Regions:
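Conserved catalytic core of nucleotide polymerization and phosphodiester-bond processing enzymes
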Residues: 1-174
Length: 174
């Protein structure tokens, strides 16, 4: 849990103070965590700096499918306003690309269900998760289709991995 908090916080530009508060550690430990993270993953720091630079030059950043997020305040003289835009320059390509990918997966899953006469219904999408209402006799086939389409929605250097959980409600499925 702490690793996830630190990872997402650092990627999205959390301050030493913010990380210390969120993880309930002192500022020294939070600073060491952030410094250690960037030493271990220098390409993350490079990505963050490059994203900000691109936004400053173009006034926007893009997702992997080239949807643009305009950042009119990226060159603001107001540090607070600029900082918000900088965090968005880092975050928007990541979250926007994830949204692009899941939408491709959703469309392909829907098409497969239609083509194969599957009665299961996609009922909810939350971030990188899809929820379905599935007749018992379709469980195995739906799982195969969903995992296949989620994992192959977009080809990347690092393979996408998907899994399925089952239950009578959302809580049980987790």
């Amino acid at each position: 849990r702490k690793a996830k908090t630190a990872n997402f916080g650092i990627i999205y530009g959390i301050s030493v103070f913010g990380l210390a508060e969120r993880m309930n550690v002192d500022r020294k430990e939070a600073k060491e965590l952030i410094d250690g993270y960037f030493e271990t993953y220098p390409s993350v720091k490079a990505y963050m700096e490059k994203s900000i630079q691109i936004a400053q030059e173009k006034g926007y950043v893009e997702t992997i499918f080239h949807r643009k997020r305009f950042l009119p305040d990226i060159n603001s003289r107001n540090a607070v306003v600029r900082g918000y835009a900088e965090r968005n320059a880092i975050n928007a390509p990541i979250q926007g690309s994830a949204a692009d990918i899941i939408k491709v997966a959703m469309a392909r899953i829907y098409q497969r269900f239609q083509t194969e006469g599957i009665q299961a219904k996609m009922i909810l999408q939350v971030h990188d998760e899809l929820n379905f209402s599935v007749p018992v006799n379709e469980k195995e086939r739906v799982e195969e289709i969903v995992i296949e389409e989620m994992e192959h929605a977009y080809r990347m250097h690092v393979p996408l991995k998907a899994d399925c959980g089952w239950g009578k409600n959302w809580l049980e499925a987790h």
